[in-house]
Amino acid sequence: KPRTSPYSFQGLRAEGLELLAHARSQTGQPIVTELMDSEHIPLFEETGVDMIQIGARNMQNFELLKAVGRTNIPVLLKRGLSATLEELVMSAEYIMAEGNPNVVLCERGIRTFETSMRNTLDISAVPMLKKMTHLPVVIDPSHAAGIAFMVPSLAKAAVAVGADGLMIEVHNDPARAKSDGAQSLTPDQFDDLMATIRPELEFFGKTLN
């Protein structure tokens, strides 16, 4: 994954895909993983990656977008740190114009003048994107705040505003996580959050999958 510092953990590359494939074989859970370079697409296809994530920093990497558009693998497209909604939608169009209609948009917080949290969640992006496009919209409350204690509140707000899904960081030992530990929930905290969100989802006529 792209990191601000070149000295930060960069991911496990091909070995990481092998581990994800093993985890899928044991649990049945699909693989969603980030693509950094179009040269890695054959490896993703060979592994049978279920969904490609295009991260915020690559939202306007148009050659990469066109390359994933020529695959038949669904794409999770994250909004750039300072991108407008129109720019996000146009990036999705780059993918779909190449023949891949399976795009999910992700609001993950944008950069503002506020410094007390990592980013600022643009909760209004959900209804606006649903007005602008037919694509599903999910929210990443973990990156939006960068602080674990805020994740449950933002997740509940995302459900209330109509998000189609949530992307939440979970780690069994956040203090020792290679990346994003400060924003990660423990498994117990995640279970508690899902238990509190379930009634909210039922109120809005949705289910927890």
Where are these regions (language model features)?
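Conserved, mostly hydrophobic/aromatic
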Residues: 44, 77, 129, 140, ...
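Catalytic cores of alpha/beta
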Residues: 38-47, 85-91, 146-164, 172
